[in-house]
Amino acid sequence: ALQDKDVDVVYTDEDKILGPDWKNVNPNFKPDFNIDLLRSYNYITHFYCVKTELIKEVGGFSDKYDGAQDYDIILRTTEKAHKIAHVSKILYHWRMHSNSTAANPESKKYCHEAGRRAVEDHLNRMGIEAQVQLSKLFGGYRIRYATPGNPMISIVIPNKDHYKDLDLCVT
């Protein structure tokens, strides 16, 4: 992926390392790029490589998202990237100790709100009308997309000769 000149962004899988013997724990096998999943939580996090030109184009890191600068830069660079590559190998090992966010993500709660703002601003830049709410799952976000107008919803319930089952489905 790094040899492909068309790739703007590369990210890899990761795990955490624990203790003096550097034991590998909590492997994080990430999916290929999925913007809807990324808007719900920062699944990319570490070992994220971006072309220098792209970092310059988006204006680099922003203090506006203190604690979630990585999430913001990932959102802004993937907005502009033409080709995003996922290397499905664990190439990043995150050291975990008692005081690190690797061991206790909730130790920096302000990061969660900063991430929410980063997603909200991303959606605004993309022209998507939505509200971003903090999820009950720390580090996750719920996106409530606006539904313009009053769209009709059709439901197809295949029930053939079981018409009484239809009543159960619609009441």
Where do the PLM segments sit?
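Acyl-group handling in specialized metabolite and lipid biosynthesis
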Residues: 37-43, 103-110
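Conserved donor NDP-sugar-binding/catalytic core segment of glycosyltransferases
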Residues: 1-25, 53, 88, 95-97
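A recurrent flexible, glycine/aromatic-enriched loop bordering the glycosyltransferase active site
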Residues: 23-53, 66
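Cell-envelope/extracellular polymer assembly enzymes that use nucleotide-activated donors
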Residues: 72, 151-156
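Short, well-formed alpha-helical segments that are part of the catalytic scaffolds
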Residues: 162-171
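Catalytic donor-sugar/metal-binding loop of nucleotide-sugar-dependent glycosyltransferases
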Residues: 63-65, 75-95, 99-101, 116-138, ...
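Donor nucleotide-sugar recognition loop
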Residues: 59-75, 110
